[in-house]
């Protein structure tokens, strides 16, 4: 193949654009979606998830996160150029057309729908509100003062879907975990929004960081505290093994470190603190994994 041919260069350019639109080169969003889904799968299956179900949720999560990123850039196409962190995205650089982005979103959603084939009908039904939340979230930044709260619901729907896929029902522990994850999402995405706060104020985008104003850090820590409290409630409801409870002091320490970091409100530090939430995700997964092992 001639690597300098017009066709190859065109395909290479489109591939680069699509990867950047999908954030395939930035896996943190997929990880933050996967952790709560894995928590739910391991709890619902007593630590032995069916491999087909596990694969369906893993691939489906990646595809829907990618679709969400594409539609987010479509929704923010008139604003990203004015924000320091997003000024180099494909839409801001004029490298992608609106129709192209919408077709890519539809294609990714179609692929994600194929992941539902091995799952039961209840999971199929629950995928409909999940799809609606994922595709409408970016537009809430125009009118809803705390769009990160809405995002929390979108990012948490994998939890009841996982319980539905495993047991064909959604028990109370699924909804406790759902509520906990909404608060966790609100916490870490508010930190994410703090990195763009100055730019968002200038262009009129609504975010939780803007709405909370000077109380943004207090709101973040309140959400973190509520998240940890609900995880403790979940532990009590499921009669968690001792290993589950070891996560709480570790997570509290990680949350305190986040508090110490974001007090500066420095853009880069806020972004790095957002990324650090991946640690909280895997700590809780390790605790749930250990619980299912020792509870047998």
Swiss-Prot record:
Any one Gene Ontology BP term: ubiquinone biosynthetic process
GO molecular function: 4-hydroxybenzoate polyprenyltransferase activity
EC main group: transferase
Transmembrane segments: 28-48, 51-71, 102-122, 143-163, 174-194, 212-232, 233-253, 274-294
Broad class of where this protein is predominantly found: membrane
Cofactor: Mg(2+)
Protein's pathway: Cofactor biosynthesis; ubiquinone biosynthesis
Keywords, comma-separated and alphabetical: Cell inner membrane, Cell membrane, Magnesium, Membrane, Transferase, Transmembrane, Transmembrane helix, Ubiquinone biosynthesis
Bilayer disposition of the protein: Multi-pass membrane protein
Annotated compartments: Cell inner membrane
Keyword Transferase: yes
The enzyme's E.C. designation: 2.5.1.39
Name of a matching Pfam family: UbiA
Reactions accelerated catalytically: all-trans-octaprenyl diphosphate + 4-hydroxybenzoate = 4-hydroxy-3-(all-trans-octaprenyl)benzoate + diphosphate
Gene Ontology CC, one term: plasma membrane
Functional note: Catalyzes the prenylation of para-hydroxybenzoate (PHB) with an all-trans polyprenyl group. Mediates the second step in the final reaction sequence of ubiquinone-8 (UQ-8) biosynthesis, which is the condensation of the polyisoprenoid side chain with PHB, generating the first membrane-bound Q intermediate 3-octaprenyl-4-hydroxybenzoate.
Family recorded in the similarity comment: Belongs to the UbiA prenyltransferase family.
Listed name of the protein: 4-hydroxybenzoate octaprenyltransferase
Species whose genome carries this gene: Neisseria gonorrhoeae (strain ATCC 700825 / FA 1090)
Taxonomic classification: Bacteria, Pseudomonadati, Pseudomonadota, Betaproteobacteria, Neisseriales
Gene that encodes the chain: ubiA
């Amino acid at each position: 193949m001639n690597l300098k041919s017009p066709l190859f260069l065109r395909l290479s350019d489109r591939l680069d654009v699509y990867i950047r639109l999908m954030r395939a080169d930035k896996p943190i969003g997929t990880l933050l979606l996967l952790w709560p889904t894995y928590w739910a799968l391991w709890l619902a299956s007593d630590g032995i998830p069916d491999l087909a179900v596990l694969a369906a949720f893993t691939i489906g999560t990646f595809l829907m996160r990618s679709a969400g990123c594409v539609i987010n850039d479509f929704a923010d196409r008139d604003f990203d150029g004015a924000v320091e962190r997003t000024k180099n995205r494909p839409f801001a650089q004029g490298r992608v057309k609106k129709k192209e982005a919408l077709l890519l979103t539809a294609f990714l959603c179609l692929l994600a729908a194929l992941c539902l084939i091995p799952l039961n009908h209840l999971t199929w039904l629950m995928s409909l509100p999940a799809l609606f939340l994922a595709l409408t979230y970016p537009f809430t930044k125009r009118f809803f003062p705390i769009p990160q709260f809405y995002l929390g619901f979108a990012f948490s729907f994998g939890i009841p879907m996982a319980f539905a896929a495993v047991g064909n029902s959604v028990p109370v522990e699924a909804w406790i975990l759902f509520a906990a994850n909404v608060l966790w999402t609100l916490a870490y995405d508010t930190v994410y929004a703090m990195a763009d706060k100055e730019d968002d104020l200038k262009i009129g985008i609504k975010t939780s960081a803007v709405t909370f104003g000077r109380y943004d850090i207090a709101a973040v820590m309140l959400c973190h505290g509520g998240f940890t409290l609900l995880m403790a409630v979940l532990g009590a409801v499921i009669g968690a093994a001792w290993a589950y409870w070891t996560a709480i002091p570790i997570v509290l320490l990680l949350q305190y470190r986040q508090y110490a970091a974001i007090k500066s409100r420095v853009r880069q530090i806020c972004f790095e603190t957002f990324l650090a939430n991946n640690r909280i995700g895997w700590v809780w997964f390790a605790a749930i994994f250990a619980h299912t092992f020792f509870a047998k």
